[in-house]
């Protein structure tokens, strides 16, 4: 296994899905809190699993990040201090459920520095398009499932993915 993606799972019946949590967080202006909690909790769980020998040291962690939110400079400093040994394994996934905030994106790039990588998640859905590929210049492109589904029998989908790769 080369990489794992950290996914949000909800244990409360009233908040029955990650989409519900994100909608509520957006309505309550709490996306930053979700961004911070996700980054720290997912990464600390990943480190714990590595320390227990359940994950190889070179395994990458794909960490979902909200396009319009970013950690503060203080958060980034704390994160780097706490997880310095993992930074080269970290891939920040930009999800495009909403339009990308250019300032937030630049803060994410600065936080990564020469370490870590950037991924564009669910390309082909939401706000994602060719412009986002050019603007983000991601290290990884995760193509949306609607494009990948039945790609083995759909020549148009095959050509689309071929064009992205080339």
Question: At which residue positions do the language-model features occur?
Answer:
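Alpha-helix-loop-beta-strand connector modules within alpha/beta enzyme cores
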Residues: 160-166
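Cyclic nucleotide signaling catalytic output domains
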Residues: 20, 24, 41-44, 64, ...
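Catalytic core of bacterial c-di-GMP phosphodiesterases, primarily the EAL and HD-GYP domains
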Residues: 32-107
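A short, well-structured catalytic beta-strand-centered motif of the EAL phosphodiesterase domain
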Residues: 1-23, 42, 141
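Conserved long alpha-helical elements within nucleotide-processing catalytic cores of c-di-GMP signaling
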Residues: 19-26, 32, 110
């Amino acid at each position: 296994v080369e990489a794992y993606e950290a996914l949000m799972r909800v244990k409360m019946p009233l908040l029955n899905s990650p989409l519900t949590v994100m909608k509520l967080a957006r309505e309550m202006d709490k996306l930053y809190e979700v961004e911070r909690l996700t980054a720290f909790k997912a990464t600390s769980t990943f480190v714990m699993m590595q320390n227990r020998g359940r994950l190889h040291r070179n395994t990458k962690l794909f960490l979902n990040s909200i396009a319009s939110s970013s950690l503060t400079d203080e958060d980034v400093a704390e994160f780097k201090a706490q997880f310095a040994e993992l930074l080269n394994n970290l891939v920040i996934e930009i999800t495009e459920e909403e339009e990308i905030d250019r300032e937030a994106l630049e803060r994410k790039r600065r936080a990564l520095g020469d370490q870590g990588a950037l991924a564009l998640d669910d390309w082909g859905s939401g706000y994602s398009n060719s412009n986002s590929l050019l603007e983000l210049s991601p290290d990884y492109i995760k193509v949306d499932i609607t494009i990948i589904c039945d790609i083995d029998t759909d020549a148009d989908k095959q050509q689309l993915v071929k064009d992205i790769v080339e």
